[in-house]
Amino acid sequence: MPDYRSKTSTHGRNMAGARALWRATGMKDEDFKKPIIAIANSFTQFVPGHVHLKDLGQLVAREIEKAGGVAKEFNTIAVDDGIAMGHDGMLYSLPSREIIADSVEYMVNAHCADAIVCISNCDKITPGMLMAALRLNIPVVFVSGGPMEAGKTKLASHGLDLVDAMVVAADDSCSDEKVAEYERSACPTCGSCSGMFTANSMNCLTEALGLSLPGNGSTLATHADREQLFLRAGRLAVELCQRYYGEGDDSVLPRNIANFKAFENAMTLDIAMGGSTNTILHLLAAAQEAEVPFDLRDIDRLSRKVPQLCKVAPNIQKYHMEDVHRAGGIFSILGELARGGLLHTDVATVHSPSMADAIARWDITQTRDEAVHTFFKAGPAGIPTQTAFSQNTRWPSLDDDRAEGCIRSVEHAYSKEGGLAVLYGNIALDGCVVKTAGVDESIHVFEGRAKIFESQDAAVKGILGDEVKAGDIVIIRYEGPKGGPGMQEMLYPTSYLKSKGLGKQCALLTDGRFSGGTSGLSIGHASPEAAAGGAIGLVQDGDKVLIDIPNRSINLLVSDEELAARRAEQDRKGWKPAAPRARRVSTALKAYALLATSADKGAVRNKALLDG
């Protein structure tokens, strides 16, 4: 059986100095026989999804100690993509994922911790911690801060979120008073933004990967029920330590739980619920850390057979995460997928022997456990707050309507094919991705004229300046991992196209990426990126581009001979933006760009450059 990793610094005469330091943190003689469990928290006052996490690490710590472990908390950084959006701050968002992963590795390995509880929530924090957990491969439990309640206003018949505020702000026909009302109402509580944006998508996927508890992705940040997830996570971490270090059961290690089948399950869920395209980027990165051979071709294969069973904002205004929870949360979607023969149910989770066992217990349409039904009735209170667990509101009933409800059965799916698709063609030889859940069926096949912008800033200026017309395909390039650097999100360009009434009359293609709040014919992650010699860098104004989602293709309608001539000319000039950009790129960002791969590889570091 494996020894505690922590024995490296807690046992032996030569570790007297280390033990002296451990004692200075509060450890006693009896503690040196216990597992040391790291709590990776991500509290910050900069991010609404993390503002309520300050005391939750210690909540978990006390539970770890009651269960027989030693808890040691540390913090990571967290970037708010919404606040960093639309300016050079967004250059730092994706690179922060690598910093978070590294910081968790540094702290856990430097202090020889035996296990981790990861307290995450927003866009890059969950992926960064997931990458670290799979890299370290020691027992881990994820517990997130939970989603925000949807906003409410008398000016709208539906729940509000961040994107609503952005769209009305860019709409010249909206009064200042309406904009102010939306601004004050869109984000009423702590928690990750209320739709199926990147943060909530990733927290849901940790359930499908088997690394978090049921309800992790959908239980509101404000609801009292969420406290139980934190308490259970602390106890479970100690239990996993006992199974691995005490009994030699390596099935509890994250790489044995998050195996190839589990990654397929996670992507299947993502496609079925119309999650953010960013999840593709993050799952590919996590798979590389886990040494799982899961790539874009697997995602393409799954996207052709998995139906869309759930539609949530920004893909539909009617539903937000609180509605997903009322409909039974993630395990109800997984249950429908399992009954459709689309899920691997023999994989283990941190909390159940198999996914089949977990579905039997947690799917509201299958279980008779009244406690489970009560759990999924947890709803919003509609009271602005930054305090976790501050309300105990219940829906009067569950949404178990699988024909017309928030979550559908396979037979009543919103669409036969799921909410994400991978497109290939001469403009993106290694692929690009589109969130089909947010694309109107009338433009699933779209041919248009290329309108070139060498940066997101230029595109925003062009769209707001009415340079973009109906029938245009906006091309935003040199915004990939290397070219940006940092692969900015393009939420402002897509939101402004909507506000200009062009949401169904234009398309957008970029080697950058999109916010989970994006909808419309928005195609990102074009690989190879322009800065790496990708064909997106060869497109010229007025070129015709054909997008064909049903046939999973995207092509520049230019002859091979012409493309070859353009490539030779670009090789001579160098793969850089044609127009200069007023962008200050720091040393930290240059270091990221030096090692970054294109999006089809998850925008992770190119290890070949490190290994020589």
From Swiss-Prot:
InterPro entries: Dihydro-acid_dehy_C (IPR042096), DihydroxyA_deHydtase (IPR004404), DiOHA_6PGluconate_deHydtase_CS (IPR020558), ILV_EDD_C (IPR056740), ILV_EDD_N (IPR000581), IlvD/EDD_N (IPR037237). Pathway: Amino-acid biosynthesis; L-isoleucine biosynthesis; L-isoleucine from 2-oxobutanoate: step 3/4; Amino-acid biosynthesis; L-valine biosynthesis; L-valine from pyruvate: step 3/4. GO terms for cellular component: cytosol. Pfam families: ILV_EDD_C (PF24877), ILVD_EDD_N (PF00920). Keywords: 2Fe-2S, Amino-acid biosynthesis, Branched-chain amino acid biosynthesis, Iron, Iron-sulfur, Lyase, Magnesium, Metal-binding. Mg(2+) binds at D81, D123, K124, E489. [2Fe-2S] cluster binds at C122, C193. It catalyses: (2R)-2,3-dihydroxy-3-methylbutanoate = 3-methyl-2-oxobutanoate + H2O; (2R,3R)-2,3-dihydroxy-3-methylpentanoate = (S)-3-methyl-2-oxopentanoate + H2O. Belongs to the IlvD/Edd family. PANTHER family: D-XYLONATE DEHYDRATASE, D-XYLONATE DEHYDRATASE YAGF-RELATED. Homodimer. This is Dihydroxy-acid dehydratase. It comes from Pseudomonas paraeruginosa (strain DSM 24068 / PA7).
